[in-house]
Amino acid sequence: QILLTQSPAIMSASPGQKVTMTCSASSSVSYMHWYQQKSGTSPKRWIYDTSKLASGVPARFXGSGSATSYSLTITSMQAEDAATYYCQQWSSNPLTFGSGTKLEXKR
């Protein structure tokens, strides 16, 4: 199965700061998908097919990458972006998730 490694595990950002988190796959995948999860809620699909934003996701989010290296970027951090973000692949069975990047907001 394909192992997804997310980095960093935990990070913090101030309002307006650019944020980048990465997801590294142990083998090449065609696309990467990202989910956002806030405490006490179910994960929400956030970015799919590497770079497409799910409905309602703000344009400050961007996804990019190919093969084994993918990233999620927030061009200008907002307080409501604080959450845990998970990458996911289904190019190869079984479907696998990364262990998450927890993004905290600095005041």
From Swiss-Prot:
What keywords is this UniProt entry annotated with?
A: Adaptive immunity, Disulfide bond, Hybridoma, Immunity, Immunoglobulin
The segment annotated Complementarity-determining-3 runs over: 88-96
Q: Which cysteines are joined by disulfide bonds?
A: 23-87
Q: Where is this region: Framework-4?
A: 97-106
- Renumbered to this chain, region (Complementarity-determining-2) spans 49-55
Framework-2: region residues? 34-48
InterPro entries to which the protein is assigned, alphabetical: Ig-like_dom, Ig-like_dom_sf, Ig-like_fold, Ig_sub, Ig_V-set, IgV_Light_Chain
Q: Which PANTHER family match?
A: IMMUNOGLOBULIN LIGHT CHAIN (PTHR23267)
* Stretches for region Framework-3: 56-87
Record keyword Disulfide bond present: yes
Q: Choose any GO biological process term that the UniProt entry carries and state it.
A: immune response
User: What name does the UniProt record give this protein?
Assistant: Ig kappa chain V-VI region NQ5-78.2.6
| SMART domains in the record | IG, IGv
Stretches for region Complementarity-determining-1: 24-33
**Where do the segments described as Framework-1 lie?**
1-23
* GO (cellular component) term, any one: immunoglobulin complex
Q: Which organism is it from?
A: Mus musculus
